[in-house]
Amino acid sequence: FVGDFGPEGLRPGTDIVGADAAWDVPLAPYFDMAEIAWNNAGTQLAYTCKPLTGTAYAVSTDSDIFVYDLADGKTHNICKPFDGKARYNAAAGHKPAMPGYDKYPVWSPDDRQIAFLSQRRAGNESDKARLFLYDCQTAQMQDLTEDFDYNAMNVVWSGSDMLYFIAPIEATHQICRIAPSVGEVEVVTRGDHDINAFSMAGDRIAAEMCTISMATEFFDVNPADGTLTQISAINKPVYDNIRMGEVQKRWVRTTDGKQMLTWVILPPDFDPAKKYPTLLYCQGGPQSVVSQFWSYRWNFQLMAAQGYVVVAPNRRGLPSFGQEWLDQISGDYSGQNIRDYLSAIDDVAKEPWADENRMGCVGASYGGYSVYFLAGCHEKRFKAFISHCGIFNFESMYGQTEELFFINNDYGGPYWDRSNTVAQRSYANSPHKFVEKWDTPMLIFTGEYDFRIPYTQSLEAFTAARVRGIPARLVEFENEAHQVFKPQNSLVWNREFFGWLNKYVK
């Protein structure tokens, strides 16, 4: 709705989407207000909308950017041809019929252009996020990051001739920029850190930055050379009284001859003459980078502080190493990325300080699936497993999740499509089909409000483990979803997490 606000309050508004159009604005499930943007003159509103319903909505990610004009009350879709015909011709400068996610419109200061993020493939939420530029006067589109093999996010204008954005690059998040007239991306910042948000502050940049060893603080960034100067030190009194473990960057050779970046976090006061219990961390997503993130849930330094070496590989399927590396996992859940996990833990296990007789494996979401799958093929590597909201049964998962487009893309299709070799390979390698090989204690977390990977997946896994006679424990949060957010529940989660590891691994 768009309505006037005056001294008497909010006047009756105008439904700019239409009462008969049951469309998401902004998009579910996060309803991010960054998907809605007024122009600077206050005369037009750009917003993200997914103009689909029913089954079409469930199997596609096709959203578009719409622009509503306050003066004439008209709306137009800048991502699709106005006449509904496929008239896209790149050589002629026509607009593409953009079938994937189109999100996050940002107006230029002069209101002549709209920058936004676009994905080419409908149904693939992990397709490359491209930075597009729409000219409001000529209706021409420009893909600014066509030759840049990383995602773009958090787009900010600097004047009307320069765009800054964040990109994941080799397991870090950096500020980049591009002048549309030049067309070449420049990486502004460097280093092992995650810049998660920023804004222009005159001729400087104010940024939020974290590392594996530091929660988010504010930094000043010099756009000329990318130099970062810390502004805030909110947590210094805390850091002054605790010890952090060393974070090592390790390149591991995979079974197919690639190099894989793996973070190794050592316990505080690490002594190379001693042997330490070691954890393999399996990342979720599955297309979600193992970067320099600081988490209140999966905190590597907290694990290290308990005396564990943490091995966190950027296995196949994770962003920041190019789209080919990321795409490989789709249709191959049980394949190369699983071998990548084992390559990482086997490489670290060769170190004299890693105790190969005291190893555990932990992960959430896709990482939870990885735990279930590895439980059936780890060949006695691990003494204990912990799975948080993991996928256990691919067939039942297909009928339970609220993101059907995701399952179709990552599994290859529905389980009943017998002619689809990719899909049939996926379902043939569902973890529940290898339970007869499970022989290792399993702790399982889940949330009753989880609609991404419903808690019934965890119930199935727990039942299977208990019937098999394997030590198993189920921790179910009745008021949590896919993650644990409530502080009291987080305390319970960590107590259970480390209690299990200390009992069976340490």
Residue ranges and their predicted role:
Residues 1, 19-32, 48-66, 77-103, ...:
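A flexible loop/linker signature enriched in serine peptidases of the S9 family
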Residues 5-8, 69-73, 135-139, 179-183, ...:
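Short loop/turn segments that connect beta-strands within beta-propeller blades
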Residues 40-41, 109-110, 158-160, 200-202:
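Residue-level detector of Asp-centered blade-edge/turn motifs that repeat once per structural unit
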Residues 45, 111-115, 162-164, 205-206:
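Hydrophobic beta-strand positions that form the internal "hydrophobic ladder"
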Residues 266, 274-284:
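Short beta-strand element of the alpha/beta-hydrolase
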Residues 286-288, 310:
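Serine-hydrolase catalytic-loop signature spanning alpha/beta hydrolases and amidase-signature enzymes
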Residues 299, 304-305, 312-506:
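Active-site-proximal cap/loop segments of hydrolase catalytic domains
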